[in-house]
């Protein structure tokens, strides 16, 4: 087996351009979650499904993201960040294309999970890419730039989704996500260079990955942060799941 070293080739992009590209990759998540929230009631009617079944697509999406990040993070250490991101985007692209043609609530749930798996594989490499290409203060500045750009996405996504719904119904939202994925795939393929160096590891890669997860699980501070973040996400998604339906019924 080979595992990618931290020493990656210098990116052909400037620091600002790299920050925008990384932010666009991370934005895949909030766009995928927030853009279709205003359309949940219409989706339930169009698919002739119970509203609560459509709401479950948020839960299935987060499950798929979790699995995609675990798989993508581990594989990216072996095969490199670029191929994992490209494969993740390809999976995302195909699933969104099929989502735009979904006919039942069951198809929606299944395809949302596949979409989330691709999104998880893609997004998980962002932090690693920044650490690969930048060090010290420069890396901190990159993360700050990405954070600034990312702050606007959860605000814009629901409004964008509502406008797309007015123009072409709820399926137009997934057509937009398809176009966005195609754009990202082209940018990643064209501007993210292949890793310059690899190193061999002399033991079973699965044992190496399992050992890393074991160290994380045995670190008390890390587990505290994980549980805190999990409960924060739980509260947020309870609100996201119910809010659009309540607002549209009351206002």
State where each predicted segment sits:
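Cytoplasmic helix-loop-helix junction between adjacent transmembrane helices
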Residues: 111-150
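Juxtamembrane intracellular "pre-TM" segments in multi-pass secondary transporters
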Residues: 6-11, 195-225
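Helix-loop-helix hairpin linking two adjacent transmembrane segments in secondary transporters
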Residues: 103, 107, 136, 144-190
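Conserved MFS/SLC helix-loop-helix module at the cytosolic interface between two early adjacent transmembrane helices
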Residues: 67-106
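Short hydrophobic/alpha-helical segments at membrane-entry points of transmembrane helices
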Residues: 106-112, 224-225
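Helix-breaking motifs and short loop linkers at transmembrane-helix boundaries and internal kinks
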Residues: 46-48, 80, 101-107, 118, ...
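Central cavity-lining transmembrane alpha-helices of secondary-active solute carriers
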Residues: 59-72, 127
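Extracytoplasmic
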Residues: 17-51, 72, 239-244
